[in-house]
Structure formats: C-alpha cells, structure tokens
C-alpha cells in the first residue's frame, strides 16, 4: 500500500502538525522516526490547542495509532506529560501509542550537557537545550541508553554505571551525574508509561501492519535543518528528510507521496543562514501576524519572504513530489508581497544552490506581487500559481487558518476564488 511522508521543506515551523493531523484521519498509523522534544507540533481540535513535542499527531476521534520509531531520541518525562494532557480529554488514548524498544533516550544530564556545550561555544548554535544533540552524540559514541535496556534492572545499572563513569571524568568539575538517581529516574518513568498503557514493540514486530495499512510518516523540523543537507553547523542532530522513514524499516518509492509543507513566507529559529530574512519593523509585523514564536522555546522566530531557491534545493534533496502551502492567510492585507526567485552567488545568478555552504554567500533576487486582503482573491491565486510553476511541483493543498479543517485541495480552493 502506498505511503505518505509529510516533511518540512524550510527551516521547520511550517505547520506540519496541523497538516499531519488533517491527513491522519485517512491513515491507520502515524509514524515519527526522527528528532525528539526539540520539535513542536501545534494541533487544534474542537477549538482547543494541543502542542506535541514527541507524540505523533494522530487523530483524536478515530482509532489511528502512533508509532515512535528508533530514529528518535525520547525524553520519557516529556512523553508522560503529553500523554497525561491527552488522557484528560481522551481517556485510554495512551494505548494507541507504540514505541520501538530500540529507540534511544534523552536523559536529564543530556539537557545539562546541552546547555554547558552551548555556553562554551565561541559561536553558539542556538539549540533548544532539550538535550537532543548530546543524546544523538552519545548514540553515535555507543554510550547511551535504549528503551530495551529498561526491561532488565541489573543490565540497566551496569550500562548506566559505565556511561556515568565516562561522563563524570570528561566533565569533571563542570557537571556530576549520580548513578542511583539516573537508574531510579529511568525505572520510574518506564513504569509510568507502562501503567498508561503504552505498547513497547519493534518495527520488525509490526512489519505486516506497516506494510499492509495506510501509513503516514510525520517529519520533524525541516530539510534545511537536516544534519547532512542543511545549513551546517546550524542544523539539528538527525535526518529531517523523507529518508528517515528507513528507521521504521520502510523504503519510500516513486509511487509514494512525499509531501513538502511550505509556509507562504519563511521563518527560522536560532542562528544560521537565512537569505530572505526581514528585520526591524517589517520583521515585527510579519512575526506578530504569523504568531511566530517557538512552540518549544517561546523564542521569537526570524521571519522573511518565501525563498524559491531554497525550496528548489529542498525539493531535490528529499524528492518532494507534492506541496501543501500553509499560513496563506498571514499575508492578508499586504500591499506588496515579495518572492525570492534565485540568488546571486559570487556575482553569478543561480536558480538553486548546489551545496549548503552556498547559502552563506547568497544574495536574494526578488520578484514583487500585488497583495491581497483574502486568500480567496485572484491575487493570491497568481502568487500561488507562480510559485508552483517555478518549483515544477504541484501545490496540491492550501491551508488558510490554524484549525485542522481550514485546509482545501487546490481544485476546491480554486473554485472558491472570488
């Protein structure tokens, strides 16, 4: 059965949570396979706001399931908090979530380590300080804890003792980790998750279910934050392209839909390249209209015009074959709207950067459009049609508000143009 992957095509915060929540009603299993609690997906259901940092964005009023795959790093305490919020409104919903036992864990000392490393950097990256980088770092260094380790108290203690010995020697005088506190923390949180009814399994165990059912892969962050293809070093510590689906033992094919979520403008959290960034009053206006404040950190997001050169790069890196345009309504009321159609790099005009380092030297080339007061006006359609043609990729859906139902297929959207 064909699969659907929904990924951010910019620097994250494109509105993936709402889009995933909309499409989850047509799918049986929603899979998250990368990142951790550094992602923030906001969902509105019956006029109530829910913010997920870890949980896949399942549909609350269906029987869809969520699967946290082994490409993630999971902060157990955060997961418990999110489940308890949902349990208050949807009793028993925790039983609809599955976790791969081979998934690695974000521990309290990872957060401390994250802050320590950030404070020591000459040029801070602007991390969320949720411990994501150190957790992935420990995974690669073979010194982290996995969910499967929690099933055996004795082996868990041995594992933690070895890790703590290394950490305390590396960070002597900077931070100190206690073995008993760490073990007790892990066992307590694991017990709480079991009592909530979370299922612990593996991609291999549910292989037939994933193969034969309708599956949606929910991306985290955006392609421009990908560890390999993003604006390094100002990136996250995991894969943010559609290829992260391999962590659930799935290989996406040309027959599957890889849907890129594209905001009608652009935003970014933290440091790093941002060719179309706006400043001062222009930035404040767009930030306020779009409510561009981080769901994870609360920080002001940097904002700017939509960037087609960046999007061409993202489409190529993740083989995007469909686009959802979000937050189209935020630009309502602008007299003029700009679109970056390419870059000047070292004095040469380019439609798309060839490598991520090119973003450091990019000077945007703009085309200006007449604005609109409502997305159902012909001027917005002209804006959208131009973008679609330039990217050579169909904008198949348009999202025009925060509610899950405020999304339309393009053909229906066009029929409503005044």
UniProtKB/Swiss-Prot annotation:
It is found in: Cytoplasm. Binds 1 Mg(2+) ion per subunit. InterPro entries: Adenylosuccin_syn_GTP-bd (IPR018220), Adenylosuccin_syn_Lys_AS (IPR033128), Adenylosuccinate_synth_dom1 (IPR042109), Adenylosuccinate_synth_dom2 (IPR042110), Adenylosuccinate_synth_dom3 (IPR042111), Adenylosuccinate_synthetase (IPR001114), P-loop_NTPase (IPR027417). IMP binds at residues 13-16, 38-41, 128, 142, 221, 236, 299. GTP binds at residues 12-18, 40-42, 301, 327-329, 399-401. Its main location: cytoplasm. Pathway: Purine metabolism; AMP biosynthesis via de novo pathway; AMP from IMP: step 1/2. Disulfide bonds: none annotated. GO terms for cellular component: cytoplasm. Its cofactor is Mg(2+). The active site is at residues 13, 41. Substrate binds at residues 295-301. GO terms for biological process: 'de novo' AMP biosynthetic process; IMP metabolic process. Its EC number is 6.3.4.4. GO terms for molecular function: adenylosuccinate synthase activity; GTP binding; magnesium ion binding. It catalyses: IMP + L-aspartate + GTP = N(6)-(1,2-dicarboxyethyl)-AMP + GDP + phosphate + 2 H(+). Keywords: Cytoplasm, GTP-binding, Ligase, Magnesium, Metal-binding, Nucleotide-binding, Purine biosynthesis. Mg(2+) binds at residues 13, 40. Homodimer. Belongs to the adenylosuccinate synthetase family. Plays an important role in the de novo pathway of purine nucleotide biosynthesis. Catalyzes the first committed step in the biosynthesis of AMP from IMP. This is Adenylosuccinate synthetase. It comes from Finegoldia magna (strain ATCC 29328 / DSM 20472 / WAL 2508) (Peptostreptococcus magnus).
């Amino acid at each position: 059965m064909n699969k659907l992957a929904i990924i951010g095509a910019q620097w994250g915060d494109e509105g993936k949570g709402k889009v995933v929540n909309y499409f989850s009603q047509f799918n049986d299993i929603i899979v998250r396979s990368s990142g951790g609690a550094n992602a923030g997906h906001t969902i509105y259901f019956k006029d109530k706001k829910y913010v997920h940092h870890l949980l896949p964005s399942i549909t609350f009023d269906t029987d869809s399931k969520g699967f946290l795959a082994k490409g993630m790093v999971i902060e157990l305490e955060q997961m418990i908090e999110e489940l308890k919020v949902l349990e208050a409104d949807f009793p028993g919903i925790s039983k609809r979530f599955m976790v791969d036992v081979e998934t690695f864990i974000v521990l309290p000392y990872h957060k401390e380590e994250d802050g320590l490393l950030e404070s020591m950097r000459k040029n801070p990256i602007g991390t969320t300080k949720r411990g994501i980088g150190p957790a992935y770092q420990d995974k690669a260094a073979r010194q982290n804890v996995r969910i499967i380790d929690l099933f055996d108290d004795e082996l868990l203690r041995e594992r933690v003792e070895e890790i703590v010995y290394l950490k305390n020697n590396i960070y002597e005088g900077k931070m100190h980790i206690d073995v008993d506190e760490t073990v007790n923390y892990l066992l307590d949180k694991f017990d709480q998750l079991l009592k909530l009814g979370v299922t612990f399994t593996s991609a291999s165990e549910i292989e037939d279910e994933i193969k034969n059912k309708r599956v949606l892969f929910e991306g985290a962050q955006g392609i421009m934050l990908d560890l390999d293809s993003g604006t390094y070093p100002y990136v996250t510590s995991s894969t943010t392209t559609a290829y992260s689906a391999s962590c659930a033992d799935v290989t996406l094919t040309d027959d599957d839909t890889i849907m890129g979520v594209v905001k009608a403008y652009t935003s970014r959290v933290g440091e790093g390249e941002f060719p179309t960034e706006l400043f001062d009053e222009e930035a404040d206006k767009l930030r306020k209209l779009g409510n561009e404040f981080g769901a994870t950190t609360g920080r002001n997001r940097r904002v700017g015009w939509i960037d087609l050169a960046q999007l061409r790069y993202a489409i190529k890196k993740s083989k995007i074959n469909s686009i959802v345009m979000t937050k189209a309504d935020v630009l309502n009321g602008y007299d003029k709207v700009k679109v970056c159609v390419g870059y000047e790099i070292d004095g040469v005009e380019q439609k798309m950067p060839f490598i991520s380092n090119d973003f450091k030297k990019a000077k945007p080339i703009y085309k200006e459009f007449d604005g609109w007061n409502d997305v159902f006006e012909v001027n917005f359609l002209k804006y959208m049609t131009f973008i679609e043609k330039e990217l050579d990729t169909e904008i198949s859906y348009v999202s025009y508000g925060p509610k899950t139902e405020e999304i339309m297929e393009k053909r229906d959207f066009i029929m409503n143009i005044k």
